[in-house]
Swiss-Prot record:
InterPro entries: PsdUridine_synth_cat_dom_sf, PsdUridine_synth_N, PUA-like_sf, PUA_sf, tRNA_psdUridine_synth_TruB, tRNA_sdUridine_synth_fam1_C, TruB_C. It comes from Ectopseudomonas mendocina (strain ymp). The lineage of its organism: Bacteria, Pseudomonadati, Pseudomonadota, Gammaproteobacteria, Pseudomonadales. It catalyses: uridine(55) in tRNA = pseudouridine(55) in tRNA. Keywords: Isomerase, tRNA processing. This is tRNA pseudouridine synthase B. Belongs to the pseudouridine synthase TruB family. Type 1 subfamily.
């Protein structure tokens, strides 16, 4: 008997998942997509399997704007295990070396200013970055170490929350592309004892914070009781990840031409940059960029059904 193909639903919006430990970001996405029975889905940048916390999952029209969430600043809390270095820079790897820990809170806090502001980081070998088309983590698993170029990242805030024995709990606000494993390893090296990430929790991704997330267990429980449609109440609006952007509302006439791909004028527009756009009914219709001539050029449009 031929297997009946599951007919997926058109679902538009963002679910803010509190990713559980042990899941890859893609595994978490596919699980939630299955629960929602959604046609189209994508996530906004990977969290390590070890990590938990804020993982925005985009569905339908929201996938068109996932890149902008990928580019957003992030916030983390991490536990640095002092005195132990590992192959991966976190608790998933094999122990490379153990050293005595002779430093305390004053020594750690004295070093933190070195990591604040714009700094250079060398990405870890165990990362999804590619070298000649091959992910670095695959090369690392094969025992290879390749040269990696240092990259500029910005640490807006770095605080020591607690020091319990040989574990330092840190809070970090940072730009995209920041590797917390590298930050912890570099701190451990300066302390002279080495360190690795024992725990990692993402607390913020762009405008989204941990308090707004839902767990996989909560989604599964609601699905078991009410099916896929019952999960729609957890969906955030398609443009919720762009809420910090300037908002323009077009007239019916301007919206019509803009949705045909034509730049239009908006007297209240900023002088430059990206904007999100609503039609005369307050419906989000896409994002645009202010051109040199002051007109708003469409960059990503959503399907309005009109």
């Amino acid at each position: 008997m031929a297997q009946v193909k599951r007919i997926r639903r058109k679902v538009d919006g963002i679910i803010l998942l509190d990713k559980p430990r042990g899941f890859t970001s893609n595994a978490a996405l596919q699980k939630v997509r299955w629960l929602l029975n959604a046609e189209k889905a994508g996530h906004t940048g990977s969290l390590d399997p070890l990590a938990t916390g804020v993982l925005p999952l985009c569905f339908g029209e929201a996938t068109k704007f996932s890149q902008y969430l990928l580019d957003a600043d992030k916030g983390y809390e991490t536990v640095a295990q002092l005195g132990v270095t590992t192959t991966t820079g976190d608790a998933e790897g094999e122990v490379l070396e153990r050293r005595p820990v002779t430093v305390g809170r004053p020594e750690i806090e004295a070093l933190l200013p070195r990591f604040r502001g714009e700094i250079k980081q060398i990405p870890p070998m165990y990362s999804a970055l590619k070298k000649d088309g091959q992910p670095l983590y695959k090369l690392a698993r094969a025992g290879e170490v390749v040269e990696r170029e240092a990259r500029s990242v910005t640490i807006a805030r770095l605080e020591l929350l607690a020091l319990e024995g040989e574990q330092a709990r840190l809070s970090v606000d940072c730009s995209k592309g920041t590797y917390i494993r590298t930050l912890v390893e570099d701190l451990g090296q300066l302390l002279g004892c080495g360190a690795h990430v024992a725990e990692l929790r993402r607390t913020k991704a762009g405008p989204f914070e941990l308090a707004r997330t839902v767990t996989l267990e909560e989604l599964e429980a609601v699905h078991a009781e009410g099916g896929s449609e019952a999960l729609d109440r957890f969906l955030q609006p398609v443009d919720s990840g762009l809420q910090d952007w300037p908002l323009l509302q077009f007239s019916e006439h301007s919206a019509f031409y803009w949705l045909q791909g034509q730049p239009v004028r908006a007297p209240e527009a900023p002088k430059f940059g990206m904007v999100r756009v609503q039609d005369h009914n307050g419906r989000f219709i896409g994002i645009g960029e202010v051109s040199d001539d002051g007109r708003i050029a469409p960059r990503r449009l959503i399907y309005t059904g009109a």
